[in-house]
Every structure is written in C-alpha cells, then in structure tokens.
C-alpha cells in the first residue's frame, strides 16, 4: 500500500496490525522486501529512475543508541545496508517526528514507515483531502481515495470528491507510466565494451555478453 499526494509518497512495512504487535512482525528480511517493492513501484509506476527512499525508525529518537529500543540497530539498519548492497538508494533510519517536522521528507522520492499511523498520520496532515491509496505490485492498476466509505454523511451532499477525483487521475498516470516503463526496458542497449583483457580481443557487438 502506497499513499501519495504530489511528490509525497508513503509506504508501510506493517499495515493493519495492532501497535502492540508491530515490533514482533518487523524483521530485516521483511523490511528489505518492502524496500525492494517500493523501489520497483517508484520506478515502474511513478517513472522515477533510481528513487531515493527514506526509512523511518520504530522507536523515538531512532532508539537513541539502544536506550529506547534495539530494533534500529538489530533490524532496521541491517535492512537498509542490505538494500544498499543491492544498489537501492535507501537511507535512514530517521525518527518520524523530526523527519516530517523539519521538512526532510521533501528530499526523498518515497518514505517507508514501520507501521500504519506512523506514516499515515503525517501524510494525511500534509496531503489534506487530495491523497490517493495505491496498491503496488498488482498486474492491474488499483487506486482509491485515501479515506473510508463515510456512510455517516451519505446522501447529505457533504462528501468532498477531491480524493476520488485524484484517484482516477492517478490510475491514468500510473497506467501511462507502466507503458513507458515497458517500452524503456523492452530492448536495453547491448554491451558496448569488453572487460580488460588481451590486446587481441575482438569485440562482437551482436552478443549480449
């Protein structure tokens, strides 16, 4: 699940789980996988080549060197390092309050939060009524408003259509971006070089390797 509005894009490691169970569901492997999925979606669905991803911490002050929790040192930092080893531009972990409060989120193409309210509370405060919910990783494009059904105001002419309108526009944009991505990656350039070797090596440009 990715929530986005303009250049602000927020994804989650855990989604609809109780806060009391968030820590036990965080593993290095799970975070690495979410970073990879987020990176792929930013590239394919949002047409951002080599996106910069900020990873939030779980504990206040990023754990304060273990004084307020060890998840950063034992789980999150190793996940970021593994993602970077796979040539993904992942950075952090950042304490959520200072990260959003200082405006640092503007320096990144995407923000990965550890749990639901950590990411969505600041997102909705910043995005206002125009946020969009996007489900990444599906073969189809799926978007929706970033709010609930609102049965309590149904039929009263009180609903704000902006999020629904933006969800429709976003679906069109993502479909277009996927088509561009497919065209861009369909026929990559062949190698135009050879590894350092003997002087009599003959370069054959008809081969990929």
Stretches with model-predicted labels:
Residues 1-71, 77-209:
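Anion-binding alpha/beta catalytic cores of soluble intermediary-metabolism enzymes, centered on
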């Amino acid at each position: 699940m990715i929530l986005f509005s303009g250049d602000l894009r927020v994804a989650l490691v855990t989604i609809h789980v109780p806060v009391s169970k968030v820590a036990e569901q965080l593993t290095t492997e799970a975070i690495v996988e979410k970073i990879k999925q987020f990176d792929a979606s930013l590239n394919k669905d949002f047409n951002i080549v080599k996106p910069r991803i900020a990873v939030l911490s779980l504990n206040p002050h990023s754990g304060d060197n273990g004084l307020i929790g060890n998840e950063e040192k034992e789980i999150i930092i190793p996940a970021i390092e593994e993602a970077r080893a796979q040539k993904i531009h992942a950075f952090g972990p950042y304490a959520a309050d200072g990260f959003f409060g200082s405006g640092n989120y503007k320096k990144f193409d995407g923000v990965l939060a550890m749990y639901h309210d950590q990411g969505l509370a600041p997102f909705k405060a910043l995005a206002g009524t125009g946020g969009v919910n996007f489900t990444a990783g599906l073969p189809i494009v799926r978007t929706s408003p970033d709010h609930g059904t609102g049965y309590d105001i149904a039929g009263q002419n009180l609903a704000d259509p902006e999020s629904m309108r933006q969800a429709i526009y976003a679906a069109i944009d993502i479909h277009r971006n996927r088509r561009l991505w497919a065209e861009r990656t369909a026929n990559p350039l062949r190698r135009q070089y050879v590894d350092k070797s003997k002087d009599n090596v003959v370069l054959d440009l008809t081969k990929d390797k």
